[in-house]
């Protein structure tokens, strides 16, 4: 109901953004509040999303046994539970973090529940693009909890995680193609075909690789992050290009792209948490002049 896998993934990205901004000077109370508060907000969004999606979930093999579909738990109870989680999560962020971190959490929540779940997912091929913003909010909330300002580092994180969401989501849409088609959800592979979806996956991974490299180039992380982002992004890109091989098994290929997307973003979140740059260190761009 609250999708623990999604919550855990967001915890890693929140921690990555927080520790990147903290630069070794970690306020444990603030970090814990950011992690718990954002996790509750994400859990709230997932629970309410299940209420909204119960009609289309009934048509999909992957989701047809959710409690909101089977009636095991009344929809009203799930909705009340989700709202309670949201109130608690936003309250923690309001009490312990700052206005900017709270604002990003609120905007991300509204976009996911109000814009994506209620309308875009069902009606537009651009639903994935809109939803990618919400998926990119957690590391920015973690980062802004420390800094209290929207600087270049926060902007890079927002763009980087938004770009990552696209090939990750398109890969899911390919290996779950039959589910999305049955529910008449206009994700890119269903609405415009596999060829276009494959192209978008490759292009988004390429741009993601370039944007990820901006963190070390702008002085927010060091050489270790640059090495990890180059290695993982190039491997992911090479894997995506295999989709153009003659006779490729699209289901298997999409699962590989999806699986490595999780490895990539986890590796980058952990590395940026450890390889932050302190003020006395020079950005990589200044070292190559």
From Swiss-Prot:
Gene3D superfamilies: UbiA prenyltransferase (1.10.357.140)
Repeat as UniProt keyword: no
Lineage top rank: taxon: Bacteria
GO CC list: plasma membrane
Subcellular location as annotated: Cell inner membrane
Record keywords, A-Z: Cell inner membrane, Cell membrane, Heme biosynthesis, Membrane, Transferase, Transmembrane, Transmembrane helix
GO MF annotations in UniProt: protoheme IX farnesyltransferase activity
Protein's UniProt name: Protoheme IX farnesyltransferase 2
């Amino acid at each position: 109901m609250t999708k623990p896998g999604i919550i855990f993934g967001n915890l890693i990205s929140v921690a990555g953004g927080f520790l990147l901004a903290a630069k070794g000077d970690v306020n444990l109370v603030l970090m814990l509040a950011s992690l718990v508060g954002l996790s509750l907000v994400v859990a709230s969004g997932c629970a309410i999303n299940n209420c909204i999606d119960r009609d289309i979930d009934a048509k999909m093999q992957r989701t047809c046994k959710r409690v909101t579909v089977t009636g095991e738990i009344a929809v009203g109870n799930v909705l009340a539970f989700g709202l309670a989680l949201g109130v608690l999560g936003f309250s923690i962020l309001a009490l312990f973090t700052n206005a900017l971190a709270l604002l990003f959490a609120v905007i991300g929540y509204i976009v996911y529940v109000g814009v994506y779940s209620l309308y875009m997912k069902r009606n537009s091929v651009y639903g994935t693009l809109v939803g990618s913003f919400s998926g990119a909010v957690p590391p920015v909330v973690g980062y802004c909890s420390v800094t209290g300002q929207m600087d270049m580092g926060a902007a890079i994180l927002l763009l980087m995680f938004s770009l990552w969401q696209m090939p990750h989501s398109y890969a899911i849409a390919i290996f779950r193609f039959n589910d999305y088609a049955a529910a008449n959800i206009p994700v890119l592979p269903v609405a415009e075909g596999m060829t276009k979806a494959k192209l978008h996956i490759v292009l988004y991974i390429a741009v993601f690789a370039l944007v990820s490299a901006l963190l070390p180039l702008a002085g927010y992380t060091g050489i270790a992050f640059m090495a990890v982002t180059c290695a993982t992004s190039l491997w992911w890109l090479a894997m995506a290009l295999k989709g153009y091989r003659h006779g490729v098994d699209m289901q298997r290929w999409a699962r590989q792209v999806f699986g490595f997307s999780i490895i990539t973003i986890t590796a980058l979140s952990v590395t940026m948490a450890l390889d932050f740059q302190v003020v006395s260190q020079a950005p990589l761009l200044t070292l190559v002049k």
